[in-house]
């Protein structure tokens, strides 16, 4: 079974598909023994059991009955994780290979249980809307929100906050008048203060919820008309904005009120706060930039030099909100609809720690916002939302392994079980994590430490079990269980054959991003270079001090170029990006699966020509030809680039002449392929149509390996375009790598 087939079945890809036998051997591998796991990955033939799972009785284990368990005919099963013997359920007595229960079937290495435990509350959606925006932007946002109401479950509980200079909490239960409670936008309120203000007697005390805070969250089917009317009648914040000033915007206060209101009403139940912001917070708490336009918003340079005077204070405020949200199992989604930065860099942990969406768009009028937001409410074949709520993620391991940590949109539950390693990678010190929200695309990097210190017999097995508890949109609690077995070996040849360079590249990319949040950018680049050199010194074939002897086996041959493109990517090279853009890009990479992550790291390039089939080509400047059309997919952008000759023919209108039908077809082919890429992509990519000499051609040139540059004229003319850059090409990068490896440098 190849790596992709295993991923299709279990949603798991390992960097090393066999593990080193001892801790000492593991330390020599450079790339950690880690896995990328997509808990809710769609699988058409997923085994589903409509009963509760059977757990190991060892209180320090509690792993779940699975196909790797040894079944004793006398009526017991032996747990492969801890070795404990457990009694089989009475109705499983006398089972055989011909009548195995579903969870013991060899095809049930991944299985989902629908438990008998009911969900007390439907999912909760809490809209938080910025009114400091122009009428066109606000109008487009209102229209999209009204459309989204038709996509929510009818029983979903809905709440609404609008804010500008003040924060308004809307009482949707008030039928006769539109009623709201006003909070100051420049004040941080405690739970008690919010409770005291909102629990004051209301106009209609006869209603059951009259004096309860739950009256601010009502079933959509009961308040849809009222809510639609409120949304349609929202207007721009009336607070005057003086010349030379920014609007007084209270995003931090609005999020503070929303977080505390949910904390007081629905602790431990699935809820999403959806923030729609059109600019930066200019009021404390959570201030991003001062109200005077003469004060510029912070840049990467300001942050690096510690010149961003509001940055650390804002991060501290939003991180405190994130901690409360995680404790309550609530999620935050942030949608930006403006050219300005809104403060995503400061607010990113609201989404990163809760599994929420971070979406950057130029305006709420754009398709990127509209379609991406509505795709968040995609449904499965039974009509249920493709989003989970209120989840936990447990990692069980046999005694040979320990959990080093996790990197992804999750938070630690701080449960230090006996399989937790002291060597932390990412979010460590635990084997249990909170997944406030997840989708079928959410992927988590899990890292393991080899605990074994002694040699083992050949073909010794280790076991890993991933257990994901979550609230399903249908109103049931479910448990997704994946159990994996890996061989432990001391032979380098077997380890080499088991290396998945794609998974390894994505795992190392996640480790690199995690380091980037703590360390200096130059130090991170030096670290990833050292790791690549060490890996090649361990697994490449070469003769010392002889460059031409350097060879990598097919299992490793693409890995250096993945690292090359990662070094050049917007994830690490932040010079041309704002802090908000960097936060957005990194958030998406920490969310997506291997295939999408690789597209982000090393974009794909397809060439189209007359009278020939489309073909993948090198992501290289030599691929630019006058008579070709190129389709670039960076995940965030889909770009169609017309070569010089093609662009001239298009301007001349040849495609409108029936005699040149094949040219018209050539122009249409990349558009059709681009449309197919756009169908399922989340968030929706930006579409760019450009040509040789066009202003937006820079998006293509910035991604290409510059093998033909202004100071390297070896391949000019018809052999490719000249790239105006001082960046090192892949060829030079590989040459330096070979020299360092064969010389024994680090």
UniProtKB/Swiss-Prot annotation:
Instruction: Enumerate the Gene Ontology biological process terms.
Output: COPII-coated vesicle cargo loading; intracellular protein transport; positive regulation of ER to Golgi vesicle-mediated transport; positive regulation of protein exit from endoplasmic reticulum; regulation of COPII vesicle coating; reticulophagy
The UniProt entry lists membrane topology as:
Peripheral membrane protein
Using the record for this protein, list the coiled-coil segments as residue ranges, or answer none. none
Fetch the Pfam families from UniProt: Gelsolin, Sec23_BS, Sec23_helical, Sec23_trunk, zf-Sec23_Sec24
Identify the residues that bind Zn(2+).
56, 61, 79, 82
What's one GO-annotated cellular component?
A: COPII vesicle coat
List the disulfide bonds in this chain: none
One Gene Ontology MF term: zinc ion binding
Keyword annotations for this protein, in alphabetical order, are:
Cytoplasm, Cytoplasmic vesicle, Endoplasmic reticulum, ER-Golgi transport, Golgi apparatus, Membrane, Metal-binding, Protein transport, Transport, Zinc
CDD domains (UniProt xref): Sec23_C
Cellular compartments annotated:
Cytoplasm; Cytoplasmic vesicle, COPII-coated vesicle membrane; Endoplasmic reticulum membrane; Golgi apparatus membrane
Which PANTHER family does the record cross-reference, listed alphabetically? PROTEIN TRANSPORT PROTEIN SEC23
Stated family: Belongs to the SEC23/SEC24 family. SEC23 subfamily.
**UniProt subunit comment:** The COPII coat is composed of at least 5 proteins: the SEC23/24 complex, the SEC13/31 complex, and the protein SAR1.
Protein role:
Component of the coat protein complex II (COPII) which promotes the formation of transport vesicles from the endoplasmic reticulum (ER). The coat has two main functions, the physical deformation of the endoplasmic reticulum membrane into vesicles and the selection of cargo molecules.
**Under which name does UniProt file this protein?**
Protein transport protein SEC23
The organism named in the record is Debaryomyces hansenii (strain ATCC 36239 / CBS 767 / BCRC 21394 / JCM 1990 / NBRC 0083 / IGC 2968) (Yeast)
Gene transcribed to yield this protein: SEC23
